[in-house]
Amino acid sequence: MMKKKISAKKKNQQQQQLHQPTMSEVTEEERTRYEEEEDVRDSPSDSSEESEDDEEEIQKVREGFIVDDEEDEVQTKKRKSHKRKRDKERPHYDDALDDDDLELLLENSGLKRGSSSSGKFKRLKRKQIEDDEDEIESQDHQGEQQLRDIFSDDEEVEEEAAPRIMDEFDGFIEEDDFSDEDEQTRLERREQRKKKKQGPRIDTSNLSNVDRQSLSELFEVFGDGNEYDWALEAQELEDAGAIDKEEPASLDEVFEHSELKERMLTEEDNLIRIIDVPERYQMYRSALTYIDLDDEELELEKTWVANTLLKEKKAFLRDDWVEPFKQCVGQVVQFVSKENLEVPFIWNHRRDYLEYVDPDAPIPGSVRELMISEDDVWRIVKLDIEYHSLYEKRLNTEKIIDSLEIDDELVKDIKTLDSMVAIQDMHDYIQFTYSKEIRQREETQNRKHSKFALYERIRENVLYDAVKAYGITAKEFGENVQDQSSKGFEVPYRIHATDDPWESPDDMIERLIQDDEVIFRDEKTARDAVRRTFADEIFYNPKIRHEVRSTYKLYASISVAVTEKGRASIDAHSPFADIKYAINRSPADLIAKPDVLLRMLEAERLGLVVIKVETKDFANWFDCLFNCLKSDGFSDISEKWNQERQAVLRTAISRLCAVVALNTKEDLRRECERLIASKVRHGLLAKIEQAPFTPYGFDIGSKANVLALTFGKGDYDSAVVGVYIKHDGKVSRFFKSTENPSRNRETEDAFKGQLKQFFDEDETPDVVVVSGYNANTKRLHDVVYNFVSEYGISVKSEFDDGSSQLVKVIWGQDETARLYQNSERAKKEFPDKPTLVKYAISLGRYLQDPLLEYITLGDDILSLTFHEHQKLISNDLVKEVVESAFVDLVNAVGVDINESVRDSRLAQTLKYVGGLGPRKASGMLRNIAQKLGSVLTTRSQLIEYELTTRTIFINCSAALKISLNKSINVKDFEIEILDTTRIHPEDYQLAMKMAADALDMDEESELHEKGGVIKELLENDPSKLNLLNLNDFANQIYKLTHKLKFRSLQAIRLELIQGFAEIRSPFRILTNEDAFFILTGEKPQMLKNTVIPATITKVTKNHHDPYARIRGLKVVTPSLIQGTIDENAIPRDAEYVQGQVVQAVVLELYTDTFAAVLSLRREDISRAMKGGVVREYGKWDYKAEDEDIKREKAKENAKLAKTRNIQHPFYRNFNYKQAEEYLAPQNVGDYVIRPSSKGASYLTITWKVGNNLFQHLLVEERSRGRFKEYIVDGKTYEDLDQLAFQHIQVIAKNVTDMVRHPKFREGTLSVVHEWLESYTRANPKSSAYVFCYDHKSPGNFLLLFKVNVSAKVVTWHVKTEVGGYELRSSVYPNMLSLCNGFKQAVKMSSQQTKSYNTGYY
């Protein structure tokens, strides 16, 4: 590291470093103290050899901006050759920063000055060259001033913000350009450009910090580039300073706004880039003015946020922690609202302010409790937004009050209102009570309409006497309610008594309507108007509203009333089954299970239920309110007036309850959504908070060489593909084997041989990861696992000690791979690779960095599920919490900034660094590439080269790791070792102090003076830092600077010892349960005891004995789980055949073998289908449920009232729907006999044809003397058993034969039709035919065929009969004869067509 000279004065400042905080933290109060201390600091000392600097200059620097580095004193020849020659173009101003000032500023900010830059501070902004020399000088001088102002601590008034922002933008992000041309050459070329200029000019001055590549893409979209030569020429002219004074065209005038918005090139995007506020904060606050609060208002915000958060966390806090908790919350509010510090910076570098230090501990500072978690800091950020929204609403209301000069006791306490609804209530009260004054004021703005016009007319009319006659005003009633409510409505007296008039309400109304000026002559209309007016006054009274809201907050009861639609559609397996009869749920109940309310709201949206929000014991509460309004008189007139008052109060309270009920439901919805979102966030954190897979013998955080294997669906003809990814993320080799190991033993051995050859060709991978699309992948995993064991494939340790370990074969999490394989990103990265290879690439990348793999999904990540109830909240909310999780982890892990410049995948993490976002991150990368040659050598260059502004630098710098590519020549740069750690630049001086103390080094030593103490420590023994007493050191710092630094010191020590060590948890290897869920989509705990369809693959029985029982069945589920059904789980005398689909219940599940034990017994299936809804007493409406059950039974009984009960074991009193539900889990051919709606002499037999296919046969019952006969389809049977055996079972066998035939296809008619078309296109020279179900006539089939590829699909109907199959009036006994008959029929039809055509022509 190059050494640099430090003046004596700077040595003195290093000695006093603990007295002076970094400029990033200086407040107005501290600044005054530091200015006083500066006199002492600047006085001569033993080490001083230089004269005192200009105090005024230093003060200007300190207040003007913060700089972290300077250009070095010595430029290389290469840099000199490109250095701008503009000393002659502008004069040097007296107030410009000199070398000592800048160096002093850098040291005060905790940064170092590079030694290879020039001693003078060189501006990086390219100046516009105008013909007028005076204008050049003026602009140059303004630019110098802007450079100072850009990092200013002082906030200017709002009115000045806009023009200053643009000035800063011009001076901050403009691209530099170096030229060796002399002045004359430039002038000549400038004139030539002017002559060539054509068309209107586009203003691209604001594009200096905008993606030039994006602009280029825009031009490509709208043409080949020639059409817009004038725009590109305009940019060249502007860069040379040759654009004249014409009004430039904006980008919006040239391009579609949607295109600009997509590429973040709009004016709003530019403002976000340049404003010195974290981009995420800008987006959060975009809907607000976000007024800078004064000290008094800030204290109110701290109290409000602390109280709000305390309500959410009170159950987790001890009573003696409440006040420390509030203090910590207040400090975080200060960081967020005033200092614009982002969550990761607060969490990582202000941790001390989130803790409570026990003052009574035996050793001061030894007992610490974390009061605020990282989740809480995120919550405070959102509460800060809520408070500013509340504050702006209150401010607007106060403006109305001031403009109207209102003198009203109700509005004087507006500053104490701490909720949006309370402020809205006050706003509504003002709008109602002072509607006339507001309307008169707004008449000048042509806004004469008022919704309170009727109230104004009545208030000024004689009818208002009847309102006054109620004997008490709404305001007085509100005060009574407020007083009584505070005392629990238990005191007998009231503040305001109610007086009764001398006449009854009817008499008064009758008298008033006789007045000549009365507005309503009709008695009923007048009475209603009077009632409505007084009810409105009560309705808009803030104190009454407060009482109603408070009551609902404490005693709200939420119930569900099911609708007819919901009654019919919500069954035991519905997601709404557990809320169908939910009643009396308190807000606390719903917050404890937030998904319940959200599912209620979803069911309400679907029209299945109606949510009722009421208050408990409403009648008693209403009586308490009425006691505050009624009079105490006993006369008839008093009784009549009390009845009138009660009617008015009931109207007002009814309206208020409706409004408050909606507010309550909405408040609960937001809270429940927040809680679900928090669970989604933690679900994602659990997946990304893991380090890369650690190879054997390496430290955690090292990346492994990975071989990813898959064969997709795992069909017999599927090839196995593999991708070898090196530890640096580069795909180096590909593997492919057509020998599918799941086919047979021979192909398995061949596959192993090919895999062995692949391993022998190059370096052995550290880990093999296996995954796929379904459960067939289990076979591939087992084969690869056995292969590694059989051949002893091992990986050696990093150290040459002879130790080794078998290569691990693990399951792979493939949710990111499934999204990546078909993404546009995959097509761009690997355009010539098949989908399965792309899948394998992402599978391997996941092991090398799970966090990066999730981040690179972009918005596709919203399709993943991180919590079972994630779908109940909006995608916007999911996206917000996903972003917060990424921000936490990216800042904890850090980002290699130079690698991000080179690697577009890694660059996607930069937007999650504190202070940055997609706009600021892209601008930073672009500027590093343009200004620094794609290499950032020190963090201080972010400030020195104007790559970031002050606040953004504070937030982002510690998360940016500086590491240089070995291929880059850095001999001319001075590397700051601390830049390779997570230590924040503001703490660099503390780090050097700790290093010096650990080495017992004198602060006056040359090594410490030149910053080499860190290098000396790292080369010597970093563990010496463990001997330091950090608690005493932290106490010393606090006494000198009033800053808490204990946790920062701990972090510094850890970083100096380990240096950006991996802090994530070790990579989590998937268990069998995880793999089971990934490959089957079934959660083991939820699949057990559920009914699922299963296909029989093998029947075990004595096939030579026709009476033998089935001994067992082998089945496979739709998710390819292999199952067995034992003999005792099969119904007696049941017959099953291979290929048959049955409904079975899962009894046992084995995730290690992907196997299950199932049952076909009816009692097991019936028990599993009942569901498991928990019915809690008092919170479940048993009465309503019983009434609904009785109602349904009554409907069924009414339909079956006239039917006879048949004495037969298969007879059921079912309707068609119940029969189908009953038969759904049964076997094909099973049936029930049920009543017929046609009359008493008919029966209906419903039998199962297939899955969700049932045939309903109408059976006519006739009596022949003492005997009966049953007729169906024209055939007569002596009894029902004969009918079932000789008719239904025979037809069922024919159906089974058809379904098992190779030419049969499952699916709907459209699906089969599409398959037939595809088949003929693939085989254009062949004809084709296929059978499928006739869904419109279950039990019968359709025959679809095409004679050639160009012919249309022809459909014939096939009827299943006892004697076989009927096709076109011909009956065929079996499938073979049916197929042959069909072919003959087609051939004859074709010949007839030819004869007909010949005769015609």
Curated annotation (Swiss-Prot):
What spans are recorded as compositionally biased (Acidic residues)? 47-57, 168-183
Gene from which the chain derives:
SPT6
Which parts of the sequence belong to the SH2 domain? Answer: 1209-1303
Family in the record: Belongs to the SPT6 family.
Q: Where is the composition biased (Basic residues)?
A: 1-12, 77-87
Gene Ontology MF, one: nucleosome binding
- Give me the stretches of Low complexity compositional bias: 105-119
Q: Which residue ranges have biased composition labelled Basic and acidic residues? A: 138-151
* UniProt name for this protein: Transcription elongation factor SPT6
Subcellular location(s): the record lists: Nucleus; Chromosome
User: What function does the entry list?
Assistant: Histone H3-H4 chaperone that plays a role in maintenance of chromatin structure during RNA polymerase II transcription elongation thereby repressing transcription initiation from cryptic promoters. Mediates the reassembly of nucleosomes onto the promoters of at least a selected set of genes during repression; the nucleosome reassembly is essential for transcriptional repression. Essential for viability.
Instruction: Give the residue ranges for region: Disordered.
Output: 1-209
Q: Which UniProt keywords apply?
A: Chromosome, Nucleus, SH2 domain, Transcription
Name which cysteines form disulfide bonds. none
Name its GO BP terms in alphabetical order.
cellular response to starvation; filamentous growth; filamentous growth of a population of unicellular organisms in response to biotic stimulus; filamentous growth of a population of unicellular organisms in response to starvation; G1/S transition of mitotic cell cycle; negative regulation of transcription by RNA polymerase II; nucleosome assembly; nucleosome organization
- The superkingdom listed in its UniProt entry is Eukaryota
Question: What do the Gene Ontology cellular component annotations say?
Answer: euchromatin; pericentric heterochromatin; transcription elongation factor complex
**One Pfam family this sequence matches:** SPT6_acidic
